[in-house]
């Protein structure tokens, strides 16, 4: 009943144009087409989702087989299923996802898109997860690090050049020295796998990166790491629809609410190591 109700809401809201990648066959089989829709949508029964072809784990990326996978992909499929539609992912470079939406080649963007004021001028957002910075430490020797605080004073950490993690580490190091404590020994490497290996080998005490990236490595790769404290410097990520497309925006919000209520949302985030970035917290 809920699928039919939501499908009625979006009947006039979803655009159908442009080219896209093939959708998940199992989702197509289980959900079927929208029960109520204009002729074009009734024939296709599709929710076109803009996704980046240059994304990163765990949000949206290509696995070793070339398939599009990730937490946002799974959320997109689940939202489409709640709407009674099958998902069809329209891939483009990240920089082109908003123009692709504006050209009506897709209906909604799910592409690690931060909710920022300048973007809210052209799209409407349904927030579904946070992004933030996290601290990875060794499971065996966590070095008494508790988060972005004075427990980092005098510790050797690794960051990537030009990242939020780098600037926040520098700020915390200055706080350490101002308090008469040793500063943070900040080292730089742009390869997360190398940095995490150094954490596990005891060459550095911690590696700072996006919390979602660290959660992915801890959950999906078997890395012997854990996150110290909670993510910080967080910002919301949202599903973006064309400005003023209220029917589709509201339908996606309702679908997400139902995914939160039935536990699907939490299950997806847990599978991808993003439970600590839930919008429900």
What is each stretch, according to the model?
Residues 95-96, 113-120, 170-171, 200-233:
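A ligand-binding cleft/hinge motif common to bilobed small-molecule-binding domains
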Residues 28-112, 262, 271:
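Extracytoplasmic small-molecule ligand-binding "clamshell" domains
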Residues 54-56, 68-81, 113, 135-191, ...:
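Bilobed "Venus flytrap"/periplasmic-binding protein-like clamshell domains
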Residues 53, 130-137, 219-257, 274-281:
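Periplasmic-binding protein-like
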């Amino acid at each position: 009943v809920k699928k039919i109700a939501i499908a009625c809401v979006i009947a006039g809201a979803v655009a159908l144009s442009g080219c896209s990648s093939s959708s998940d066959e199992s989702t197509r089989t289980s959900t079927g087409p929208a029960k109520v829709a204009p002729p074009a949508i009734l024939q296709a029964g599709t929710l076109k989702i803009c996704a980046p072809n240059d994304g990163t784990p765990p949000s949206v990326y290509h696995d070793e087989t070339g398939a599009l996978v990730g937490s946002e992909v799974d959320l997109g499929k689940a939202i489409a299923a709640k709407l009674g539609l099958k998902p069809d992912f329209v891939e483009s470079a990240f920089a082109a996802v908003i123009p692709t939406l504006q050209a009506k080649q897709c209906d909604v963007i799910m592409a690690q898109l931060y909710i920022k004021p300048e973007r809210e001028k052209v799209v409407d957002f349904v927030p579904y997860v946070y992004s933030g910075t996290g601290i990875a430490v060794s499971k065996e020797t966590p070095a008494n690090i508790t988060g972005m605080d004075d427990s980092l004073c005098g510790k050797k950490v690794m960051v990537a050049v030009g990242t939020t993690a780098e600037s926040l580490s520098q700020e915390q190091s200055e706080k350490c020295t101002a308090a008469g404590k040793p500063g943070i020994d900040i080292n730089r490497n742009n390869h997360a796998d190398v940095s995490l290996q150094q954490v596990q080998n005891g060459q550095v005490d911690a590696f700072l990166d996006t919390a979602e990236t660290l959660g992915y490595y801890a959950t999906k790769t078997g890395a012997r790491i854990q996150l110290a404290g909670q993510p910080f410097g967080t910002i919301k990520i949202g599903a973006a629809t064309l400005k003023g497309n209220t029917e589709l925006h509201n339908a996606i919000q309702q679908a997400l609410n139902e995914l939160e209520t039935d536990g699907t949302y939490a299950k997806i985030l847990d599978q991808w190591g993003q439970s600590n970035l839930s919008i429900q917290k």
